[in-house]
């Protein structure tokens, strides 16, 4: 068989037409050193700050130091098998985590991967972990309450939707217990919750998850776990990942509550990363931008207005505001609130709940110190009935503390002073509350009414706890309809005042104290 020149030329033309070459430009580099979870890379000329760098074995590192001839990056996960000379490449993306309702009821790691053994999470939405906080024009003032269920908190340091309220205290003073009870109290409020555990023991996190499940709050909660066994990079990024998950609800006109437990450990993880990257240390060896570490996180907690939600959802949600309320936790050393990280976070947040080890050890739990605990914006969000009835609580406690210190040195006291001391002791006793026993607005109102209008004056100090239990049982059993209505509205007027008075009068008439 012979081919003529025309056929050959046609065949060549056909082959040339079918020839397809795809050229792909990739920005690659080479690892030049690996140490303590930090890798130095040579050759990545176009890398961005915070960009994800693809490593061998389906892992990623995050570029943090951009130097003249190398890039310092922190590895997200195990790094023992990484070696000098390995090739890495830019991805052109910053870190994103899955967000959405599919994560509710699940325990995930910093990267949003499930670690609870319940299978994959069905999810299509992703959000960057670093997002600029809403601007001043997009925000709305805080005027709706977040009920924690604690008498001491809801009456003296109320929290509003969109507020940042710091929980600060030494170790073992009930900081996590307070935050977990606040989450449990939201199970029927419609507020979605995110609990971010940073640098805690895995057994402690498992215990928290079990308690949330026992009290029916896990289905409404996302748990982001970066335990003590995780790398410093994952502990540093966990709060930002949790915040991105909370912002999903805020930006769609819903309300969310996020607990960061705790930001002291995040600051330590960031200090570790910064020192390994050879960044210059500052006060207490923290890097110079440790304030910015927390401010850019906590500024993302806010209440946004209807226009913001409508613009974000492209008109799907109208006439709704969204909020993300933050409860950051800070652990102090020997009650020193003037240390670097505590003062930073106090200055960023809208108030603080200070828990004292002396109060905790003397049996006053929650160990809230009313003298230095404050809520800067929560007062305008407080439920009307609680606001009206709780006015005398803080004053009574302040006078009691002052007189108690004086009474230690004075032997004979006049009747007015004795009366004030007795009242202060009873109020202190009444504000005690067990864990996992949050109270509704109506239940708190009944108790505060009893304090405000002298129904405790003839009750012995040792019987205060049983008086409270019996009073709540009587109110819920005999006035269920009124209690439900008060929970719904939270209003206070002459009619409600008369009803509360009749409840207390009826209770005192039927039982002797």
UniProtKB/Swiss-Prot annotation:
Main location: membrane
Assembly and oligomerization: F-type ATPases have 2 components, CF(1) - the catalytic core - and CF(0) - the membrane proton channel. CF(1) has five subunits: alpha(3), beta(3), gamma(1), delta(1), epsilon(1). CF(0) has three main subunits: a(1), b(2) and c(9-12). The alpha and beta chains form an alternating ring which encloses part of the gamma chain. CF(1) is attached to CF(0) by a central stalk formed by the gamma and epsilon chains, while a peripheral stalk is formed by the delta and b chains.
HAMAP family: ATP_synth_alpha_bact
One annotated Gene Ontology cellular component of this protein: proton-transporting ATP synthase complex
Function, as annotated: Produces ATP from ADP in the presence of a proton gradient across the membrane. The alpha chain is a regulatory subunit.
Gene: atpA
Protein name from the UniProt record: ATP synthase subunit alpha
Pfam families: ATP-synt_ab (PF00006), ATP-synt_ab_C (PF00306), ATP-synt_ab_N (PF02874)
EC numbers, comma separated: 7.1.2.2
Any one Gene Ontology molecular-function term assigned to this protein's record: ADP binding
Family: Belongs to the ATPase alpha/beta chains family.
NCBIfam families assigned to the protein according to its UniProt record, in alphabetical order: atpA, PRK13343.1
Annotated source species: Haemophilus influenzae (strain 86-028NP)
Keywords: ATP synthesis, ATP-binding, Cell inner membrane, Cell membrane, CF(1), Hydrogen ion transport, Ion transport, Membrane, Nucleotide-binding, Translocase, Transport
């Amino acid at each position: 068989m012979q081919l003529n020149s025309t056929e050959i030329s046609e065949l060549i033309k056909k082959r040339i037409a079918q020839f397809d070459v795809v050229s792909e430009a990739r920005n690659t580099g080479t690892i030049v050193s690996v140490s303590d979870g930090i890798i130095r890379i040579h050759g990545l000329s176009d890398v961005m700050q915070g960009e994800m760098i693809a490593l061998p074995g389906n892992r990623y590192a995050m570029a943090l130091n951009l130097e003249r001839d190398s890039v310092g990056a922190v590895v997200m996960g195990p790094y023992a098998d990484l070696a000098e000379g390995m090739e890495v490449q830019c991805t052109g993306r910053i870190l994103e985590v899955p967000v959405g309702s599919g994560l509710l009821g699940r325990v995930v790691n910093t990267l949003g991967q499930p670690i609870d053994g319940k299978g994959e999470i069905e999810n299509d939405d992703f959000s960057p972990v670093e997002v600029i906080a809403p601007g001043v024009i997009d925000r709305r003032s805080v005027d709706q309450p977040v009920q924690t269920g604690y008498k001491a908190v809801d009456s003296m340091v109320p929290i509003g939707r969109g507020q940042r309220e710091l929980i600060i205290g030494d170790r073992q003073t009930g900081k996590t217990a307070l935050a977990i009870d606040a989450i449990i109290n939201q199970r029927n409020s419609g507020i979605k919750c995110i609990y971010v555990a940073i640098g805690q023991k895995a057994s402690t996190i498992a215990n928290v998850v079990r308690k949330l499940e026992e009290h029916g709050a896990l289905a409404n909660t996302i748990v982001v776990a970066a335990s003590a066994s995780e790398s410093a990079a994952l502990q540093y990024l966990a709060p930002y990942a949790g915040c991105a998950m909370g912002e999903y609800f805020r930006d769609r006109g819903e309300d969310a509550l996020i607990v960061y437990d705790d930001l002291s450990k995040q600051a330590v993880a960031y200090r570790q990363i910064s020192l390994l990257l050879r960044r210059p240390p500052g006060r207490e060896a923290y890097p110079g931008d440790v304030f910015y570490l927390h401010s850019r996180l906590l500024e993302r907690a806010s209440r946004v207005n209807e226009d913001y939600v409508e613009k974000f959802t492209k008109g799907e949600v109208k006439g709704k505001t969204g909020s993300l309320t933050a409860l950051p936790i800070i652990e102090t050393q020997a009650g020193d609130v003037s240390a670097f990280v505590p003062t930073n976070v106090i200055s960023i947040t809208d108030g603080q709940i200070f828990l004292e080890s002396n109060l905790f050890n003397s049996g006053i739990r929650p160990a809230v110190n009313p003298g230095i605990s404050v809520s800067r914006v929560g007062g305008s969000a407080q439920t009307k009935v609680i606001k009206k009835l709780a006015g005398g609580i803080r004053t009574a406690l302040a006078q009691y503390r002052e007189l108690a210190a004086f009474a230690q040195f004075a032997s004979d006291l006049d009747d007015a002073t004795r009366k004030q001391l007795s009242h202060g002791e009873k109020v202190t006793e009444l504000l005690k509350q067990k864990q996992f026993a949050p109270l509704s607005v109506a239940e708190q109102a009944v108790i505060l009414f009893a304090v405000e209008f002298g129904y405790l004056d003839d009750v012995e100090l040792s019987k205060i706890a049983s008086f409270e239990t019996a009073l709540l049982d009587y109110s819920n059993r005999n006035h269920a309809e009124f209690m439900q209505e008060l929970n719904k509205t939270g209003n206070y007027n002459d009619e409600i005042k008369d009803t509360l008075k009749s409840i207390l009068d009826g209770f005192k008439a039927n039982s002797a104290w």
